Amino acid sequence: PPLATRGIGGKPLDAFAIDTIRLPFDNPWDALLFTAGHDFLPDGSALVCTAHGDVWRLTGLDASLENVTWRRYATGLFQPLGLKVVDGRGYVIGRDQITRLHDLNADGEADFYENFNNDLLSAGGGHAYATSLETDSRGNFYFTKCAEGTAHGGSLIRVSGDGGKLGVFATGFRNPNGLGIGPGDVITVGDQQGGWVPETRVDVMRRGGFY
């Protein structure tokens, strides 16, 4: 059954109006709610993925935020840390693959988890995360992969819009966990401090670049 929480609207005069929505920590599955990615569906509801493998669908995201409902939409994913809605369907990036979620019987829960692309190489280390799923104006998908001993480690990865091809777009990162694509398909990536990276930074990407 859906779970209900409430939210608090942000101040509209601030540079960014940040709405705060309470998480349904008291839920039938005792599911942990380490939120990791979100995007909005055409009807104004939202999909939110959590690091422990769930995707939740939120409704009631109106101006009042008095009755925000949460329904677990998908579960069992491998540490999903990025989510993107394209043509009304949720795409989730996990350590293992991009998964496209389908609700075939329109009951509010995904019943088909499609392997959209699983060409990603992963050594399974403690920091072998894939994060931050976004798309460009041509429909290509992008995500970041933390450094490890594979050809895809420490890279910005691009996947074709049909899921048929995966390749490295840029490399040299440590543990990137932030990706944005702006006007003109300008791509920015945020790397994290540690090891050979003296401070957290944001870089503007160029194809084939080393950062």
Model-inferred region functions:
Residues 1-211:
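Beta-propeller domains with acidic blade repeats across secreted/periplasmic ectodomains
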